Amino acid sequence: MTKEVPYYCDNDDNNIIRLFIIRHGQTEHNVKKILQGHKDTSINPTGEEQATKLGHYLRSRGIHFDKVVSSDLKRCRQTTALVLKHSKQENVPTSYTSGLRERYMGVIEGMQITEAEKYADKHGEGSFRNFGEKSDDFVARLTGCVEEEVAEASNEGVKNLALVSHGGAIRMILQWLKYENHQAHKIIVFNTSVTIVDYVKDSKQFIVRRVGNTQHLGDGEFVVSDLRLR
Protein backbone atom coordinates (compact mmCIF):
# COMPACT_ATOMS: atom_id res chain seq x y z
CA MET A 1 0.00 0.00 0.00
CA THR A 2 1.36 3.42 -0.96
CA LYS A 3 1.90 5.70 2.03
CA GLU A 4 -0.28 8.81 2.01
CA VAL A 5 1.77 12.00 1.66
CA PRO A 6 -0.22 15.25 1.59
CA TYR A 7 0.15 17.14 -1.72
CA TYR A 8 2.22 14.33 -3.30
CA CYS A 9 -0.66 13.67 -5.68
CA ASP A 10 -2.38 14.96 -8.79
CA ASN A 11 -3.81 18.45 -8.52
CA ASP A 12 -7.31 18.92 -9.94
CA ASP A 13 -7.90 22.50 -8.76
CA ASN A 14 -8.22 24.89 -11.72
CA ASN A 15 -6.84 27.72 -9.56
CA ILE A 16 -3.58 25.87 -8.83
CA ILE A 17 -0.59 24.76 -10.87
CA ARG A 18 1.29 22.06 -8.97
CA LEU A 19 5.03 22.05 -9.67
CA PHE A 20 6.87 18.76 -9.22
CA ILE A 21 10.52 19.86 -9.16
CA ILE A 22 12.81 16.86 -9.71
CA ARG A 23 16.58 16.67 -9.41
CA HIS A 24 18.44 14.52 -11.95
CA GLY A 25 19.78 11.07 -11.09
CA GLN A 26 23.24 10.45 -9.70
CA THR A 27 26.32 10.98 -11.88
CA GLU A 28 29.91 9.86 -11.37
CA HIS A 29 30.79 13.51 -10.78
CA ASN A 30 28.29 13.53 -7.90
CA VAL A 31 30.00 10.49 -6.38
CA LYS A 32 33.46 12.04 -6.73
CA LYS A 33 32.27 15.49 -5.55
CA ILE A 34 33.30 17.11 -8.81
CA LEU A 35 31.72 20.44 -9.76
CA GLN A 36 29.65 19.85 -12.88
CA GLY A 37 28.02 23.18 -13.67
CA HIS A 38 27.33 23.15 -17.41
CA LYS A 39 29.50 20.08 -18.08
CA ASP A 40 27.28 17.68 -20.02
CA THR A 41 27.66 14.60 -17.81
CA SER A 42 25.54 11.44 -17.92
CA ILE A 43 23.77 9.69 -15.06
CA ASN A 44 25.43 6.50 -13.83
CA PRO A 45 23.78 3.09 -13.20
CA THR A 46 22.68 4.22 -9.74
CA GLY A 47 21.14 7.33 -11.29
CA GLU A 48 19.30 5.18 -13.81
CA GLU A 49 17.94 3.02 -10.99
CA GLN A 50 16.86 6.10 -9.03
CA ALA A 51 14.99 7.55 -12.01
CA THR A 52 13.37 4.19 -12.75
CA LYS A 53 12.19 3.88 -9.15
CA LEU A 54 10.76 7.39 -9.26
CA GLY A 55 8.84 6.54 -12.41
CA HIS A 56 7.34 3.44 -10.79
CA TYR A 57 6.53 5.41 -7.64
CA LEU A 58 4.73 8.17 -9.55
CA ARG A 59 2.68 5.55 -11.34
CA SER A 60 1.80 3.85 -8.05
CA ARG A 61 0.52 7.19 -6.75
CA GLY A 62 -1.48 7.83 -9.91
CA ILE A 63 0.39 11.05 -10.63
CA HIS A 64 0.12 12.26 -14.21
CA PHE A 65 1.93 15.31 -15.53
CA ASP A 66 0.22 17.58 -18.04
CA LYS A 67 3.58 18.93 -19.15
CA VAL A 68 7.29 18.44 -18.46
CA VAL A 69 10.07 21.01 -18.80
CA SER A 70 13.64 19.82 -18.27
CA SER A 71 17.10 21.31 -18.23
CA ASP A 72 18.69 20.60 -21.60
CA LEU A 73 21.79 19.01 -20.04
CA LYS A 74 22.18 15.28 -20.63
CA ARG A 75 21.82 14.16 -17.02
CA CYS A 76 18.39 15.81 -16.82
CA ARG A 77 17.31 14.58 -20.26
CA GLN A 78 18.20 11.01 -19.30
CA THR A 79 16.40 11.30 -15.97
CA THR A 80 13.31 12.75 -17.66
CA ALA A 81 13.21 9.93 -20.22
CA LEU A 82 13.44 7.20 -17.58
CA VAL A 83 10.90 8.79 -15.24
CA LEU A 84 8.38 9.19 -18.05
CA LYS A 85 9.03 5.71 -19.42
CA HIS A 86 8.48 3.96 -16.10
CA SER A 87 5.49 6.07 -15.11
CA LYS A 88 3.92 5.32 -18.52
CA GLN A 89 3.87 9.00 -19.49
CA GLU A 90 6.06 8.97 -22.58
CA ASN A 91 3.46 10.92 -24.57
CA VAL A 92 3.33 13.87 -22.18
CA PRO A 93 4.44 17.13 -23.91
CA THR A 94 8.10 17.60 -22.97
CA SER A 95 10.51 20.43 -23.70
CA TYR A 96 14.11 21.26 -22.80
CA THR A 97 15.58 24.60 -21.82
CA SER A 98 18.92 26.09 -20.81
CA GLY A 99 16.99 28.19 -18.29
CA LEU A 100 16.89 25.30 -15.81
CA ARG A 101 20.59 24.47 -16.07
CA GLU A 102 22.88 24.30 -13.06
CA ARG A 103 24.99 27.31 -12.22
CA TYR A 104 27.87 27.83 -14.67
CA MET A 105 31.06 27.50 -12.61
CA GLY A 106 33.61 28.78 -15.12
CA VAL A 107 37.23 27.74 -14.74
CA ILE A 108 36.55 25.47 -11.75
CA GLU A 109 34.11 23.20 -13.58
CA GLY A 110 35.56 19.69 -13.51
CA MET A 111 37.44 20.28 -10.25
CA GLN A 112 36.70 18.43 -7.03
CA ILE A 113 35.24 20.73 -4.38
CA THR A 114 38.41 20.59 -2.24
CA GLU A 115 40.52 21.45 -5.29
CA ALA A 116 38.19 24.33 -6.17
CA GLU A 117 38.47 25.69 -2.62
CA LYS A 118 42.27 25.66 -2.84
CA TYR A 119 42.11 27.34 -6.26
CA ALA A 120 39.86 30.09 -4.88
CA ASP A 121 42.19 30.67 -1.93
CA LYS A 122 45.22 30.80 -4.22
CA HIS A 123 43.54 33.45 -6.36
CA GLY A 124 42.38 35.59 -3.45
CA GLU A 125 38.71 34.64 -3.61
CA GLY A 126 36.72 34.00 -0.46
CA SER A 127 34.75 31.17 -2.05
CA PHE A 128 34.91 29.00 -5.16
CA ARG A 129 31.32 30.14 -5.77
CA ASN A 130 32.74 33.51 -6.83
CA PHE A 131 33.80 31.98 -10.14
CA GLY A 132 31.57 31.63 -13.18
CA GLU A 133 27.96 32.78 -13.19
CA LYS A 134 27.22 35.48 -10.63
CA SER A 135 24.54 34.71 -8.06
CA ASP A 136 22.27 37.52 -9.25
CA ASP A 137 22.51 36.30 -12.84
CA PHE A 138 21.86 32.71 -11.77
CA VAL A 139 18.76 33.72 -9.80
CA ALA A 140 17.48 35.91 -12.63
CA ARG A 141 17.89 33.10 -15.16
CA LEU A 142 16.18 30.47 -13.01
CA THR A 143 13.33 32.59 -11.72
CA GLY A 144 12.69 34.08 -15.13
CA CYS A 145 12.42 30.55 -16.52
CA VAL A 146 10.11 29.34 -13.73
CA GLU A 147 7.83 32.36 -14.04
CA GLU A 148 7.71 32.02 -17.82
CA GLU A 149 6.86 28.31 -17.64
CA VAL A 150 4.18 28.90 -14.99
CA ALA A 151 2.61 31.69 -17.06
CA GLU A 152 2.60 29.46 -20.14
CA ALA A 153 1.17 26.56 -18.13
CA SER A 154 -1.58 28.83 -16.85
CA ASN A 155 -2.51 29.86 -20.37
CA GLU A 156 -2.55 26.22 -21.46
CA GLY A 157 -4.72 25.04 -18.56
CA VAL A 158 -1.93 22.87 -17.13
CA LYS A 159 -2.58 21.71 -13.56
CA ASN A 160 0.44 19.46 -12.97
CA LEU A 161 3.82 20.63 -14.26
CA ALA A 162 7.11 18.77 -13.80
CA LEU A 163 10.40 20.68 -13.83
CA VAL A 164 13.59 18.59 -14.01
CA SER A 165 16.68 20.45 -12.86
CA HIS A 166 19.81 20.37 -10.69
CA GLY A 167 20.67 20.48 -6.99
CA GLY A 168 22.08 23.99 -6.89
CA ALA A 169 19.31 25.29 -9.11
CA ILE A 170 16.56 23.80 -6.93
CA ARG A 171 18.15 25.22 -3.79
CA MET A 172 18.31 28.62 -5.44
CA ILE A 173 14.63 28.42 -6.43
CA LEU A 174 13.75 27.59 -2.81
CA GLN A 175 15.87 30.49 -1.62
CA TRP A 176 14.07 32.81 -4.07
CA LEU A 177 10.79 31.60 -2.59
CA LYS A 178 12.16 32.56 0.83
CA TYR A 179 11.95 28.98 2.07
CA GLU A 180 13.46 28.54 5.55
CA ASN A 181 14.25 32.25 5.86
CA HIS A 182 16.75 32.25 3.01
CA GLN A 183 18.66 29.26 4.43
CA ALA A 184 17.64 27.01 1.54
CA HIS A 185 21.25 26.87 0.32
CA LYS A 186 21.99 24.63 3.31
CA ILE A 187 19.47 21.99 2.21
CA ILE A 188 20.80 18.87 0.54
CA VAL A 189 18.62 18.18 -2.49
CA PHE A 190 19.16 14.47 -3.13
CA ASN A 191 19.31 12.91 -6.60
CA THR A 192 15.80 12.31 -8.02
CA SER A 193 14.19 13.93 -4.97
CA VAL A 194 10.84 15.62 -5.58
CA THR A 195 10.04 19.09 -4.28
CA ILE A 196 6.41 20.16 -4.59
CA VAL A 197 5.33 23.78 -4.92
CA ASP A 198 1.81 25.03 -5.62
CA TYR A 199 1.26 28.20 -7.61
CA VAL A 200 -2.08 29.80 -6.72
CA LYS A 201 -3.34 31.74 -9.71
CA ASP A 202 -5.73 34.21 -8.11
CA SER A 203 -3.26 35.34 -5.44
CA LYS A 204 -0.18 34.86 -7.66
CA GLN A 205 1.47 33.10 -4.74
CA PHE A 206 3.86 30.16 -4.53
CA ILE A 207 3.41 27.75 -1.62
CA VAL A 208 6.08 25.14 -0.81
CA ARG A 209 4.35 21.86 0.08
CA ARG A 210 7.10 19.22 0.20
CA VAL A 211 10.89 19.51 -0.04
CA GLY A 212 13.26 16.79 -1.22
CA ASN A 213 10.94 13.78 -1.01
CA THR A 214 12.83 10.54 -1.69
CA GLN A 215 10.27 7.96 -0.62
CA HIS A 216 10.70 6.19 -3.95
CA LEU A 217 14.19 5.35 -2.67
CA GLY A 218 12.86 4.19 0.69
CA ASP A 219 13.71 7.44 2.45
CA GLY A 220 11.73 10.43 3.69
CA GLU A 221 11.91 14.15 3.10
CA PHE A 222 12.48 17.49 4.77
CA VAL A 223 9.47 18.43 6.88
CA VAL A 224 7.58 21.36 5.44
CA SER A 225 4.64 23.17 6.93
CA ASP A 226 2.46 25.03 4.45
CA LEU A 227 4.48 28.11 3.65
CA ARG A 228 2.95 30.95 1.70
CA LEU A 229 6.04 32.42 0.23
CA ARG A 230 6.18 34.41 -2.95
From Swiss-Prot:
<protein>
    <recommendedName>
        <fullName>Broad-specificity phosphatase YOR283W</fullName>
        <ecNumber>3.1.3.-</ecNumber>
    </recommendedName>
</protein>
<dbReference type="GO" id="GO:0005634">
    <property type="term" value="C:nucleus"/>
</dbReference>
<dbReference type="Pfam" id="PF00300">
    <property type="entry name" value="His_Phos_1"/>
</dbReference>
<feature type="active site" description="Proton donor/acceptor">
    <location>
        <position position="102"/>
    </location>
</feature>
<keyword id="KW-0378">Hydrolase</keyword>
<feature type="active site" description="Tele-phosphohistidine intermediate">
    <location>
        <position position="24"/>
    </location>
</feature>
<keyword id="KW-0963">Cytoplasm</keyword>
<dbReference type="InterPro" id="IPR013078">
    <property type="entry name" value="His_Pase_superF_clade-1"/>
</dbReference>
<feature type="site" description="Transition state stabilizer">
    <location>
        <position position="166"/>
    </location>
</feature>
<dbReference type="GO" id="GO:0016791">
    <property type="term" value="F:phosphatase activity"/>
</dbReference>
<feature type="binding site">
    <location>
        <begin position="102"/>
        <end position="105"/>
    </location>
    <ligand>
        <name>substrate</name>
    </ligand>
</feature>
<keyword id="KW-0539">Nucleus</keyword>
<dbReference type="GO" id="GO:0005737">
    <property type="term" value="C:cytoplasm"/>
</dbReference>
<dbReference type="InterPro" id="IPR001345">
    <property type="entry name" value="PG/BPGM_mutase_AS"/>
</dbReference>
<dbReference type="InterPro" id="IPR029033">
    <property type="entry name" value="His_PPase_superfam"/>
</dbReference>
<dbReference type="InterPro" id="IPR051695">
    <property type="entry name" value="Phosphoglycerate_Mutase"/>
</dbReference>
<feature type="binding site">
    <location>
        <begin position="36"/>
        <end position="37"/>
    </location>
    <ligand>
        <name>substrate</name>
    </ligand>
</feature>
<comment type="function">
    <text>Metal-independent phosphatase active against a broad range of phosphorylated substrates including nucleoside tri- and diphosphates, phosphorylated organic acids, and amino acids. Shows no activity against phytic acid, phosphorylated carbohydrates, and nucleoside monophosphates.</text>
</comment>
<comment type="similarity">
    <text>Belongs to the phosphoglycerate mutase family. BPG-dependent PGAM subfamily.</text>
</comment>
